[in-house]
Every structure is written in structure tokens, then in C-alpha cells.
């Protein structure tokens, strides 16, 4: 069965680019999102997120009649579910969004449909989703019931793209295809090949789920090494960035760069999915998470020390000292604030500090709710002119262009080594 109509459930940082990629190949794409504001923006041919090159693709797709957004699922040949999968307070995976998405498409499923879960999920999530669908559509058969002969095919195909490069990597990167049966994998591969230039690498759904978790856990462990090294170097009076530069001259050493912690909806979340299912075995993965989650607390302590130094060297009261935090996003040059350590650091500073806390984030127009009323969103030049203590949290291009003489006479906490 060919794919004439494709529906993408969830029009966020992954879902919207995916929908746009299919629409750019002149497929009829229906994007579904519960956010009416996002739906309205997309239907105007605009985008509600910051992602280079995405805006033009969406504009052309909407104007060409190949992409439309709605809040209610409709009948389609294929469904891709790209909704959030956060963790609960105890670090257990929260599959509520996936369950809601599955139940929303169940009434419009037809024989021959393909359902793909893209959301990063714990091992077994695809089988669980198939169970939810089967429970709601007893008139159809699913892979766990009928194998290769199932009426509905189901697969797990994780995204593996870099924010800021999504429209390139979505097309160029290889794709892991984890069907519940070989037929499911074959159909999922055929769907992605509509726009994919990379290779479709086929496996089963459980291995595909674990592959995504493994990729992000590997990165988290390596970042934890760099972050722990930065703590050690601070105690020893060593420039960690110079140290890493020298160590990386070894042909078999490639240490990553330290920072204020780890953010985003993948690396800061996914390792916990492994830990939750394998608490006795995943000791290194758990420790890496604890190291990276602890780094923001260390940064706040450095800011407190800088304020103390400022007070000792000036005649200002604490309430007169202004602190400027540079960056809120979880990585450079994007507007995505999910799980960003910079957000928590700015919030902690503002709650502790009796003076004004300025925030500079060139990729947003207003402060998120958790900072509204605590901080002041400021322009770059104004913050540089007013602040006594500068806190570098995200190495946006605008910040890397700041001349050294603009910061060298200040009290500086540089978590990214931009002003070293």
C-alpha cells in the first residue's frame, strides 16, 4: 500500500520538521497538535519554533497545499507519533502523551495503516502502544496478534537530529527502523525513503528503542567526565579548557567540553529510562546523570563567590549588585529551553540574590513563566553596561562575538570557556 496521506501527531521540534520533510516531497501531510495556537501559526505558513531553514519549507508546503495542521486526527495511510516523553518525579518514564496520542488516532485507523512511534521511549513502549491500539480497535488485527498478516503495521523509529541542524540531519542521517515484524520494518523503511537520503538500518522494535537510549546515555557519560574534570581543575587551579585542548592532542583521546550541566529533552532525560528499568546494572549511567545534574549547583556557588568578591572590592550593598546571565537555551543558537541547566541556574540566582538578575537570551521574546517576575529580560548591550557579575551559560554566537575588553574588568563566571 502506498502512502498518499501522512499524519504527524505532535508538531514540536521534531514533529513539525518531519511533517515539512514529507510535504516537501509533495505528499499530503496532516499535522496534529493539541496546541491551537501552534496549529493556527502553521496554517498561516509560519512556524512557532526556532529552527534554521524550517520556516521556508513550511511556508512553501502550506502555500502548495501539501501541509495543514489540525487539533483532531483524521484518516491517513501512515501516522508518526512525535510527542514528549518526560520522566516523573521518581525518574520513571511518563508515557501519558504517547498513550493519549495512540488513543486519539485509534478511532480513525484503517486496515493497511502504518503507525510509527518516534518519541524517545523505554524498551517495550512500542509493544505497549500496540496493546493500547488493539484494545480500542478489536475489529482490526495488530502485529502482536497476527504477525506478518496484521491489518495495522507498527514500528519504532527514533529521531537522531541536532537542534539547529534538523532540516539537514533529518534527510542525511541514517535511520534505525524497528518494526514489530519484518513487514512492519519494510513498510516503515519505504515511508522514510520518501525523503531520506541516509540508510534505513533495520532491527526489531526493542533494539531500536534501546539504541536511542544508548546513544544519548553514551553522550551523557562522556559529558559527565568533562564536567567532573572541570570541578577537579577548579580545585587545582588549572584551566580546564587548556587541559582538554592539550589532552585531546593524544590520538586516542577526545574529551568533550564542560558546561553548566546537561539539558534538552534527550540527553538529560533518556538515561533515566535505562536506569528505571535496570537499576542494579546501570550504575555508571546513574552516576553520570548525578554528576551532570549536580553541575548547576556548583555554578550557583561560583556566582555567590563572585558576588562576595564584588562586595569586598566595592562600596556597594548586595541589593545594588546586578548579575547578568547570558543564555537560557539548552544549547547554542536555538530557542529550546527544555531541561536547560541555564534555566535552573538563573532561577536559583534570582531567588538567592537581593539585587536585580538580568537575563540575555536573543532567541526568545519573553521570559518563561518560571522566571517571570524573578528576572529581567535584557538586551545584550544593556546587560554588559549594567551588570557587575557576568555569568556565561550558553555560548550563542552573539555572546562569542563580545570583545574581551567588555568583560575582563568584571566579575565573571564562564561555564563555557568563551571568555577565557
Curated annotation (Swiss-Prot):
Designated name of the protein: UDP-N-acetyl-D-mannosamine dehydrogenase
One Gene Ontology term of the molecular function aspect: oxidoreductase activity, acting on the CH-CH group of donors, NAD or NADP as acceptor
Keywords: NAD, Oxidoreductase
SUPFAM superfamilies referenced in this protein's UniProt entry, alphabetically: 6-phosphogluconate dehydrogenase C-terminal domain-like, NAD(P)-binding Rossmann-fold domains, UDP-glucose/GDP-mannose dehydrogenase C-terminal domain
Record: residues binding NAD(+): 13-14, 33, 85, 126, 338
Residues forming the catalytic site: 212, 266
Superkingdom per UniProt: Bacteria
Entry EC no(s): 1.1.1.336
Subunit structure: Homodimer.
SMART domains xref list: UDPG_MGDP_dh_C
Cross-referenced PANTHER family: UDP-N-ACETYL-D-MANNOSAMINE DEHYDROGENASE
Job description of the protein: Catalyzes the four-electron oxidation of UDP-N-acetyl-D-mannosamine (UDP-ManNAc), reducing NAD(+) and releasing UDP-N-acetylmannosaminuronic acid (UDP-ManNAcA).
Gene (UniProt): wecC
Family: Belongs to the UDP-glucose/GDP-mannose dehydrogenase family. WecC subfamily.
Pathway stated in the Swiss-Prot or TrEMBL entry: Bacterial outer membrane biogenesis; enterobacterial common antigen biosynthesis
Amino acid at each position: 500500500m502506498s502512502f498518499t496521506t501522512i499524519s504527524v501527531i505532535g508538531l514540536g521540534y521534531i514533529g513539525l520538521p518531519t511533517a515539512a520533510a514529507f510535504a516537501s516531497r509533495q505528499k499530503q501531510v496532516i499535522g496534529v497538535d493539541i496546541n491551537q495556537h501552534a496549529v493556527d501559526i502553521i496554517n498561516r505558513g509560519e512556524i512557532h519554533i526556532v529552527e534554521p531553514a524550517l520556516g521556508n519549507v513550511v511556508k512553501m508546503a502550506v502555500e502548495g497545499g501539501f501541509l495543514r495542521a489540525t487539533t483532531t486526527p483524521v484518516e491517513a495511510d501512515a501516522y508518526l507519533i512525535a510527542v514528549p516523553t518526560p520522566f516523573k518525579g521518581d525518574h520513571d518514564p511518563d508515557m501519558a502523551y504517547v498513550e493519549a496520542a495512540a488513543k486519539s488516532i485509534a478511532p480513525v485507523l484503517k486496515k493497511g495503516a502504518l503507525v510509527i512511534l518516534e518519541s524517545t521511549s523505554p524498551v517495550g513502549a512500542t509493544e505497549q502502544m500496540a496493546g493500547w491500539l488493539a484494545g480500542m480497535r478489536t475489529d482490526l488485527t495488530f502485529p502482536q496478534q497476527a504477525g506478518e498478516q496484521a491489518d495495522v503495521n507498527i514500528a519504532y523509529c527514533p529521531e537522531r537530529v541536532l537542534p539547529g541542524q534538523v532540516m539537514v540531519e533529518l534527510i542525511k542521517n541514517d535511520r534505525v527502523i524497528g518494526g514489530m515484524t519484518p513487514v512492519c520494518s519494510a513498510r516503515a523503511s519505504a515511508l522514510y525513503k520518501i525523503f531520506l537520503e541516509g540508510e534505513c538500518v533495520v532491527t526489531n522494535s526493542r533494539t531500536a528503542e534501546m539504541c536511542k537510549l544508548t546513544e544519548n546515555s553514551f553522550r551523557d557519560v562522556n559529558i559527565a567526565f568533562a564536567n567532573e574534570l572541570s570541578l577537579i581543575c577548579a580545585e587545582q587551579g588549572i584551566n580546564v579548557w587548556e587541559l582538554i585542548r592539550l589532552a585531546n592532542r593524544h590520538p586516542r583521546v577526545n574529551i568533550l567540553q564542560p558546561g553548566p550541566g546537561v539539558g534538552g529533552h534527550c540527553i538529560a532525560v533518556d538515561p533515566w529510562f535505562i536506569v528505571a528499568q535496570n537499576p542494579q546494572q546501570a550504575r555508571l549511567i546513574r552516576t553520570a546523570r548525578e554528576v551532570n545534574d549536580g553541575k548547576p549547583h556548583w555554578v550557583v556557588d561560583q556566582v555567590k563567590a563572585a558576588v562576595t568578591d564584588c562586595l569586598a572590592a566595592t562600596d556597594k550593598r548586595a541589593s545594588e549588585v546586578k548579575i547578568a546571565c547570558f543564555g537560557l537555551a539548552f544549547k547554542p543558537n536555538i530557542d529550546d529551553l527544555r531541561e536547560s541547566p541555564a534555566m535552573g541556574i538563573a532561577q536559583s540566582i534570582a531567588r538567592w540574590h537581593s539585587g536585580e538578575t538580568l537575563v540575555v537570551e536573543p532567541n526568545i521574546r519573553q521570559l518563561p513563566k518560571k522566571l517571570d517576575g524573578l528576572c529581567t529580560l535584557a538586551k545584550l548591550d544593556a546587560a554588559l553596561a549594567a551588570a557587575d557579575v557576568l555569568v556565561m551559560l550558553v555560548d550563542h554566537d552573539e555572546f562569542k562575538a563580545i570583545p574581551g575588553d567588555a568583560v575582563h574588568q568584571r566579575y565573571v563566571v564562564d561555564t563555557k570557556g568563551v571568555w577565557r
